[in-house]
């Protein structure tokens, strides 16, 4: 059986005074992890993993809709199919 695996990284620009709250909210999303946050610049690097592109897109939209987020930029995306091939 094949499974699909998707991963992307995002640069999130946010209001600097809200970085801590935003990081907490993003880390609560399934498959979402704040890898780096820099309060003075208001930037976060976020890694998102999902089993399909629809879930990945929904998570990116959820990140975009968090209060205090100003912009979300996709900087990397990889998709792989995993599993055994059967004749």
Swiss-Prot record:
Disruption phenotype annotation: Deletion mutant lacks periplasmic nitrate reductase activity, with either glycerol or formate as the electron donor.
Gene3D superfamilies, A to Z: 3.30.70.920
GO biological process entries: negative regulation of protein transport
Chaperone in keyword set: yes
Gene Ontology MF annotations: signal sequence binding
Subcellular location: Cytoplasm
Subunit and partners: Monomer in solution. Interacts with the cytoplasmic NapA precursor.
The protein's name: Chaperone NapD
Species, as recorded: Escherichia coli (strain K12)
